[in-house]
A protein has these predicted regions:
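Conserved, mostly hydrophobic/aromatic
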Residues: 11, 19, 42, 98, ...
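Catalytic pocket-lining loop regions of alpha/beta-barrel enzymes
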Residues: 17-18, 31-122
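Mid-domain alpha/beta scaffold segments of enzyme catalytic cores
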Residues: 1-28, 33, 106
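Active-site micro-motifs of SAM-dependent methyltransferase domains
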Residues: 26, 129, 159
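Mid-to-C-terminal alpha-helical segments outside catalytic/metal-binding sites
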Residues: 133-163
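C-terminal active-site rim and adjoining tail of enzyme catalytic domains
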Residues: 124-128, 132
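Short, aromatic/basic amphipathic alpha-helical patches
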Residues: 8-11, 64-65, 89, 138-143
């Protein structure tokens, strides 16, 4: 974690508009102090962050850590086991977004859109670890309008990285 902010600043100066972290693979918990410092820097820069959120409790922690922040935080890898928690956290924290690679329920897109709005969904496939079609087909076969599907596939992420 040493020099994390200066490293991120160099990447920002190179044109990076989005960052990603993998706490469960990197062996740390979202509540650690260096991550809070990184979140504060991202908020000051107005930069979005993708953060893996595969464990129950992490969406709640991330919501608490970003309370009052305006920088978008995109929850990645949310699945049936923690989707309810993620939606509750998103309802309380308007800067949280949901990446869709773990959204496998038949009515998953409709349920999330009805709960927090289609504008908070960011398409993700999980590729190359997962088949692209297994993430795309539930969206294409959902009852969302073509305009809403376009928001999920392209427009929502574009809006966040161009802000």
């Amino acid at each position: 974690f040493r020099d994390m902010i200066s490293e991120a600043e160099r990447r920002r100066q190179q044109g990076f508009r989005l960052f990603r972290v993998f706490p469960h693979l990197q062996g740390w918990q979202p509540r650690i102090a260096p991550f809070r410092t990184f979140l504060q820097w991202l908020n000051e820069q107005g930069l979005p962050l993708l953060v893996d959120c595969p464990q129950v409790g992490w969406a709640s922690e991330l919501a608490e850590l970003t309370q009052g922040s305006s920088a978008p935080l995109i929850l990645v890898g949310v699945h049936e086991g923690n989707l309810g928690e993620a939606l509750s956290a998103m309802s309380a924290c308007p800067n949280l977004y949901l990446e869709t690679s773990g959204l496998k329920q038949p009515d998953g897109y409709e349920m999330v859109a009805a709960t927090v709005g289609v504008e908070r969904l960011i398409f993700g496939s999980g590729a190359p670890l997962h088949y692209f079609a297994s993430a795309l087909l539930p969206l294409l076969h959902s009852s969302l309008s073509d305009e809403e599907k376009r928001k999920v596939l392209v427009d929502n992420l574009r809006r966040l990285v161009q802000a």
